[in-house]
Amino acid sequence: MKFLIPTAKEIKEDNKPYPQHLSQKSQILVNHMNALSIEELEKSYKVSPQIAQTELLKWQDIKNGEALAYPALYLFNGLMYRHIKRQHLTVEEKAFLKEKVFITSALYGIIPALKPIVPHRLDFNTKVKIKGESLKNYWRKTYDNFVLDNPSIVSLLSSEFEAVFSPKLRNQLITLRFLENQNGQLKSHSTISKKARGAFLTQVIQQQTKTVDELKTISFNGFSYQDNLSEPLKLIFIKQSK
């Protein structure tokens, strides 16, 4: 069983840097981004000219091999990541992380959580075409092959990242939903989901969870599995309001 988590917009460059390494597919993407003008980057990212200028310089550093890379799990610092246990890992927990947890990226594809990557702004909502393809289509075969090679995958992804997979293989992912029971109504929003995904993955790492049945036994921060609302590949966890 493998676990997929998305990248995040917030980053924190305070860990030991490493030399960068790009796959051939990532290098093609980097070359394309370097060929864009500041005006094109401004439109693609939907940012100001000043930010576009900064991003162009970053892409030039990446292409020239001058950008520093950081372990992905520690580089990202979004809400979900801040709820994942990343410090003071035991030997067993770190080994589990290295083998079981992967990060989905618009620049790198699907990578081990501890792989060093360079800070970048690219995501699947960035409006660029690589060889005439959107970023989602550019990476689709790579993402699909990961599912074909790993028959049991738990998705802790947002819809933006799940949409990269072809529909047939997307339906093979084990997905999780985290809802709060507020006065008899089940509710969810991005803050609830992001916090819960991070805290859930922490439990997975600590408990060395390896099967769907073991996933169902996890309870954390008031959330617990609800069999009556779940389906074989869609697991629902509810937090009861006080």
Curated annotation (Swiss-Prot):
GO terms for biological process: response to hydroperoxide. GO terms for cellular component: cytosol. Belongs to the UPF0246 family. PANTHER family: PEROXIDE STRESS RESISTANCE PROTEIN YAAA (PTHR30283:SF4), PEROXIDE STRESS RESPONSE PROTEIN YAAA (PTHR30283). NCBIfam families: PRK02101.1-4 (NF002543). This is UPF0246 protein SMU_2070. It comes from Streptococcus mutans serotype c (strain ATCC 700610 / UA159).
